[in-house]
UniProtKB/Swiss-Prot annotation:
GO terms for cellular component: cytosolic large ribosomal subunit. This is Large ribosomal subunit protein eL18. It comes from the Eukaryota. Belongs to the eukaryotic ribosomal protein eL18 family. Residues 170-180 have a biased composition (Basic and acidic residues). Coiled coil: none annotated. GO terms for molecular function: RNA binding; structural constituent of ribosome. Keywords: Cytoplasm, Ribonucleoprotein, Ribosomal protein. One of its GO terms (biological process) is translation. The gene is RPL18. It is found in: Cytoplasm. InterPro entries: Ribosomal_eL18 (IPR000039), Ribosomal_eL18/eL18-A/B/_CS (IPR021132), Ribosomal_uL15/eL18 (IPR021131), Ribosomal_uL15/eL18_sf (IPR036227).
Amino acid sequence: MGIDISHRNKRKVVRRNPKSGDVYLRLMVKLYKFLARRTHSKFNNIVKRRLFMSRINRAPLSLSRLTRQMKKPGREGKIAVVIGTVTNDIRMREVPKLTVCALRVTAGARTRILKAGGKVMTVDQLALKAPLGKGTVLLQGPRKAREACRHFGPAPGVPGSHTKPYVISKSRERTNAHRA
């Protein structure tokens, strides 16, 4: 008598293409697939893999976090590469001169970078300037900073748990707070 083996968990799920139908993203993927294949560069392979990622895994990076990362020793004059969105941060008074390459840069962040004498590049411009990733710093936004992530973890109410409960209404009486 044979054993009914479950084969559904055997396959390792790896993205080979982006789910998005964005034509510009598809062109970047085409370019970096070619570069990764022909150059055997680790940098190009990482960029290619990050282009495949979902929006959640391509978390936005704020201008303040970007400058903090680029101020580290040995990173002066290098190109900050973000495969995602660079957003403005109004809490920051002054923005230093930066060269940023990103999939998307918000209007506020773009004006502040350019006003500081910096430069904003697209991913295809980076392929021409640094085809092997020389003089670049790969950065990414914090993935766990999403509001939804606060609800993940051990059940709220369990000792030592800081998980946020799902509450539909916040009424005067705590007992009346209905949980989803």
